[in-house]
């Protein structure tokens, strides 16, 4: 009789059997899957020996094509052939419209505000389209490894916000993949280079792919790998190089009218081919719409120089945020196919003052790093090695307080996973509910930050203003996903929410938020000071008004009451002004003139409490 094999759920009954896990680079232009085979971590090839899978999906009436075959049909069937879908992940239709002519698709908006693309198979969401790419990679991996996967580490740009990360996890679930972790692409690149096992130092990861740019500054300390700062641009990459070349070709060819989707696809293919050849050759021949000519590398460099400059500005900002100097950076790692462009490499080298590292294929390095991390998370690390990855959140998280102010709970560039709590209180007497408004951004006023979610805490016991204590806790998990809870400590009533925005940030919005916070820091500080003084003034006026109604006639003379009311009137008159100092001075005057009144009220309360009681009763 055979013995029953018993194991923990999800674990192998054979202790020495490897659990099959992979790393996936879900890219804008190309995607890859990698795994450990025969002691070497490398990308997995398809039946034709190709490791790169173009991130292109074509819908037929009865089937779906993914990869090179779909890419070849892009010009002939543009409406049913979807590329660069990563740019649409976690976005709303309003964001998509800003991309304009770069997206030659027919969009339809659903109730969820997610954009849907009309195809011959019906409307498809970016999540569904991305799932087709992930499904193709899963099937390739299971065929190559000879078994079912226990999970995958999937990489995302460091600047992906909560909505974009959640959309990626949803796509993986549709594709039948268990997500072991979402890993920032620059972090994966550092893992691939084995930087965690090298000497201590500071490393910059410059990641320029097809559609996104990321820069990360990493510190290596005794095997601990920490991301000090991140930056980037969610709408900058090799696709933009293609569009710059395409615009130049149209200008040279004298074409001014709008192109049909198929014509636009063909033009972008010509532009992309020219870009790739210029990484090797100094001059390439280009022909389009009856025009033929030469494109020199010098001209190409001039076309893309503004785009490279955008990436370098993000680099300088990330270095400043990290708290290190440029000359402290000991290595610069290049990631992403667009870093093959000589002008990119020379510009980055000039900024950091050293030759960038390009040892590993920039198209494969992210998938390799993800696969190494997947091995660890799957429990296959036989040597007992553990990799400590400390990613960071890109923008501060907080909530709204009185006066429309943003109170930061978790500052940007805080390592994750993380949990932070802060206590708040009620503003009015008898307040039994509190609205929690969760925000993301760097500015002081909520009008300048991004709203993530709202939820209400009900059942707060009625108390005087300021007596209740509400503890608000923010938790960000290892995938960068946020949950917020609020609990009234006396009664234990609690409410919580997992933040799942219906769409993500618009193009460049994160960069704009950071730039605004730096440029308008003084203005924001003044605005916050004014709002805080206005809140204090309003709170004081309401408290004094309530005290006058309750005890004014009993404890104050007519002259004293008139003096207090005169100071209250002066403070009210200042509420519409912008004079912070004047409001602060008047708050002090009103506080001082009511000190004696407050003392009398306290004495009266104590006397009432002690009336009819003996000293021995009190001592007992």
Curated annotation (Swiss-Prot):
Pfam families: HSP70. It comes from the Bacteria. InterPro entries: ATPase_NBD, Heat_shock_70_CS, HscA_NBD, HSP70_C_sf, HSP70_peptide-bd_sf, Hsp_70_fam, ISC_FeS_clus_asmbl_HscA. SUPFAM superfamilies: Actin-like ATPase domain, Heat shock protein 70kD (HSP70), C-terminal subdomain, Heat shock protein 70kD (HSP70), peptide-binding domain. Keywords: ATP-binding, Chaperone, Nucleotide-binding, Stress response. CDD domains: ASKHA_NBD_HSP70_HscA. One of its GO terms (biological process) is iron-sulfur cluster assembly. GO terms for molecular function: ATP binding; ATP hydrolysis activity; ATP-dependent protein folding chaperone; unfolded protein binding. HAMAP family: HscA. Chaperone involved in the maturation of iron-sulfur cluster-containing proteins. Has a low intrinsic ATPase activity which is markedly stimulated by HscB. Belongs to the heat shock protein 70 family. This is Chaperone protein HscA homolog. It comes from Stutzerimonas stutzeri (strain A1501). The lineage of its organism: Bacteria, Pseudomonadati, Pseudomonadota, Gammaproteobacteria, Pseudomonadales.
């Amino acid at each position: 009789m055979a013995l029953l094999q018993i194991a923990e759920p999800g674990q192998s009954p054979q202790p020495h059997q490897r659990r099959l896990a992979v790393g996936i680079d879900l890219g804008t232009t190309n995607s890859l899957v990698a795994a450990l085979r025969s002691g070497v971590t490398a990308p997995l090839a398809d039946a034709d020996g190709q490791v790169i899978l173009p991130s292109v999906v074509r819908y037929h009436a009865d089937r779906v094509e993914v990869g090179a075959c779909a890419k070849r049909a892009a010009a002939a069937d543009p409406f049913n052939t979807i590329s660069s879908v990563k740019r649409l992940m976690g976005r709303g239709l309003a964001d998509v419209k800003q991309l304009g002519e770069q997206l030659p698709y027919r969009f339809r908006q659903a109730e969820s505000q997610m954009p849907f693309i009309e195809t011959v198979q019906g409307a498809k969401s970016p999540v569904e389209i991305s799932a087709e790419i992930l499904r193709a990679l899963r099937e390739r991996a299971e065929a190559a490894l000879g078994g079912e996967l226990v999970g995958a580490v999937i990489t995302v740009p460091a600047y992906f916000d909560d909505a974009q990360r959640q959309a990626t996890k949803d796509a993986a679930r549709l594709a039948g993949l268990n997500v072991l972790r979402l890993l920032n692409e620059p972090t994966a690149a550092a893992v691939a280079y084995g930087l965690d096992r090298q000497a201590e130092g500071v490393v910059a990861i410059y990641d320029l792919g097809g559609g996104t740019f990321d820069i990360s500054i990493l510190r290596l300390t005794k095997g601990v790998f920490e991301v000090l700062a991140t930056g980037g641009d969610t709408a900058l990459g090799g696709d933009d190089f293609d569009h710059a070349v395409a615009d130049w070709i149209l200008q040279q060819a004298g074409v001014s009218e709008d192109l049909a989707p198929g014509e636009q696809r063909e033009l972008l293919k010509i532009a992309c081919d020219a870009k790739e050849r210029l990484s090797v050759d100094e001059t390439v021949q280009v022909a389009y719409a009856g025009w033929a000519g030469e494109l020199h590398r010098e001209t190409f460099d001039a076309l893309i120089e503004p785009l490279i400059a955008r990436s370098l500005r993000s680099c300088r900002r990330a270095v400043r945020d990290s708290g290190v100097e440029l000359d402290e950076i000991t290595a610069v790692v290049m990631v992403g196919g667009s870093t093959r462009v000589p002008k990119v490499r020379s510009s980055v080298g000039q900024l950091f003052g050293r030759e960038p590292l390009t040892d590993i294929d920039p198209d494969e390095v992210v998938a390799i790093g993800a696969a190494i991390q997947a091995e660890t998370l799957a429990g296959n690390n036989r040597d007992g090695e553990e990799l400590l990855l400390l990613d960071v959140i890109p923008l501060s998280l907080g909530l709204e307080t009185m006066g429309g102010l943003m109170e930061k709970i978790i500052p940007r560039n805080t390592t994750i996973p993380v949990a932070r709590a802060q206590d708040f209180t009620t503003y009015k007497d008898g307040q039994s509910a509190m609205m929690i408004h969760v925000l993301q951004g760097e500015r002081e006023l909520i009008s300048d930050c991004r709203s993530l979610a709202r939820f209400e805490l009900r059942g707060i016991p009625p108390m005087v203003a300021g007596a209740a204590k509400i503890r608000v806790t923010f938790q960000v998990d290892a995938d960068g996903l946020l949950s917020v809870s609020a609990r009234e400590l006396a009664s234990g009533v609690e409410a919580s929410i997992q933040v799942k925005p219906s769409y993500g940030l618009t193009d460049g919005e994160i960069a704009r938020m950071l730039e605004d916070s730096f440029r308008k820091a003084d203005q924001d500080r003044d605005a916050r000071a004014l709002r805080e003084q206005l809140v204090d003034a309003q709170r004081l006026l309401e408290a004094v008004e309530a005290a006058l109604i309750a005890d004014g006639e009993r404890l104050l003379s007519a002259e004293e009451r008139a003096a207090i009311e005169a100071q209250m009137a002066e403070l009210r008159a200042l509420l519409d002004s912008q004079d912070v100092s004047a409001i602060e001075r008047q708050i002090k005057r009103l506080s001082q003139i009511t000190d004696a009144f407050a003392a009398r009220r306290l004495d009266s309360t104590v006397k009432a409490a002690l009336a009819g009681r003996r000293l021995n009763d009190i001592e007992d």
